[in-house]
Structure formats: C-alpha cells, structure tokens
Amino acid sequence: MARTDNDTWDLASSVGATATMVAAARAVATRAPDAVIDDPFAEPLVRAVGVDFFTRLATGDLTPTDLDPDATGGAGNMDRFADGMAARTRFFDDFFSDAADAGVRQAVILASGLDSRAYRLPWPAGTVVFEIDQPGVITFKSDTLARLGAKPTADHRTVPVDLRDDWIGALEAAGFDRTEPSAWIAEGLFGYLPPEAQDRLLDQITELSPPGSRLAVEGVVSSPDADDEQIRERMQAVRDQWRQFGFDLDFSELVYTGERAEVAAYLGERGWRTDSITATALLEKCGLQSAEDSSANFADVRYVTAVK
C-alpha cells in the first residue's frame, strides 16, 4: 500500500516491517563469525513481532543461502544486507560512544523502531536516552523488553509520538533540555521522509542543539529519475524473491525518491561541522566485504556526522 500523509503502522506492516527486517539482519550479523556488533535483543524482539519470515531469519532457521541459492549478490542477498546493517549499527554505536567521551549526556534516537541501544550500550552515569517513535511501536518494544527482564543502562525515557506531529513538545515534556548539548541519530529514516520533511527535521534538530551538540545521519543521495526507477525495480525484485518464503511487501511503495538536499552541505550551511563516509568505505572500515556493483544496494547513502 502506498504512503499517505497520515499513515500509521505496526512492526509487521508498512514502514514498521522494515524496522523488523533490520532487527532480523542485526540478529544475523550478531551470529556471524568475528561479528562487528552484538545485539542480544534483536532476535527476541523479532520473534515477539511474529512475522514468520523474519523470525526464521533471526533464529537461523532460514539462512541467507536459502534466500539466494545462486549467490547472485543482489539487493535481496541477506549476507550483504546483514553486513550493511552491521556496519550501519556499528557507525551509530561508535557515534554515541564518541559523544559520551566528549561529555554529552543527552541522547535522542529518532524513529527508534526496534533499536535497543538504551539497553545494550555502556552509557556513562547521568546519561538520559530519549526514544521517539509511533506510540504502538514504543509500547510494543517496551513491554517486550520488560517481559524479557531487560533493564536500561541509562535513564531511558520513551517519547511516543509521530515525527509528523508535535514531537518537540512531547520530547521536552519528557525532560529534554534544549540548553544542554545533545547527541542525535537518524538511522534508516530519511528515505521514508519526503524531501521537505527531511529539511524540516534537520532545521528542528538544529534549533534544539546548542554548541557541543552532535548529530549522526544516514543520508540518502539524490538520484536522477532514471536511477529512481532502477531503485524501485530492485526493490520489487526483492519483493518477488522473498514472496516465495511467505513475506510480501513492496518496499518501493514505502520510500520517497527524487531530489533532496545533501545532508552534509545542508547542515554545514546551518552552522554544523560535518564529516561523511560512503557505505562502501564504512563496510571496508568494519572489515566487511562491500558490494561489487550498485545493483546490490537499494540506494546510494552517506553516513554523516556533525558537531555544532
């Protein structure tokens, strides 16, 4: 089903299902030899969502080889996807670690999905971690982790609000202090936002961030219309590939393509000092194999860090 202005979802449908897909990939990556991440909550959270396809992936009952027996290495190859999510996860984990080392004690996770950093990272004493996502997603994850006996490793405050609504008011009501430096992440979010919503969100973060604040973003690079069509074709090919295993979701209906601001440049114009790394370079930095050609990727992304 195509996106609408006020659409909602749970973790088994629409955009929410992509959060479960990413958590399943983190579970696969956690089991890998010489794993670059350790997310012990990924598998149980995926199992709790109850999408059979993702549960089988997360538990190892369905292997990457099962999904791609001919080893085509395309966008539906779970080994490559899990490696990509492992590198991405490590990037944002390291970002929070660096921010903590710099003395930042406020962290904000935008559209947190099944992110478990509030429970698995070694936060310094006095750190407050805010998680923002749709109310149903927040409630499900909090209840599931409580049943598992998981305890946050920081002062954990959930903010159940859609980013299209008054999330700033909800964040401040939860205790966020805009006069103190903060560390923000937007992981796997911008592709699901229209270009103008991306700009608005970056402006809002800038407004809430005094000097010393930090931001890490997975930015989607603008592409010509012809490239957009290729991206949609790859997404539809993955849908066809995975449908035989009982999972049917057209990813191409969930994303917004077309021209959008380049994140590093946009932030630089608003007083941030930025640095960026390509997905390929990030994989290599983590000791993981990068895709041999762009057909293995849904889109071209840059991982951006910024300091104010």
Swiss-Prot record:
EC number(s) on file: 2.1.1.-
Molecular function as annotated in GO: methyltransferase activity
Protein's UniProt keywords contain Ribosomal protein: no
InterPro entries: Ppm1/Ppm2/Tcmp (IPR007213), SAM-dependent_MTases_sf (IPR029063), SAM_mthyl_Trfase_ML2640-like (IPR011610)
Alphabetical keyword list: Methyltransferase, S-adenosyl-L-methionine, Transferase
SUPFAM superfamilies the UniProt entry points to: S-adenosyl-L-methionine-dependent methyltransferases
Family of this protein: Belongs to the UPF0677 family.
Function comment: Exhibits S-adenosyl-L-methionine-dependent methyltransferase activity.
Designated name of the protein: Putative S-adenosyl-L-methionine-dependent methyltransferase Mjls_1073
Organism, as annotated: Mycobacterium sp. (strain JLS)
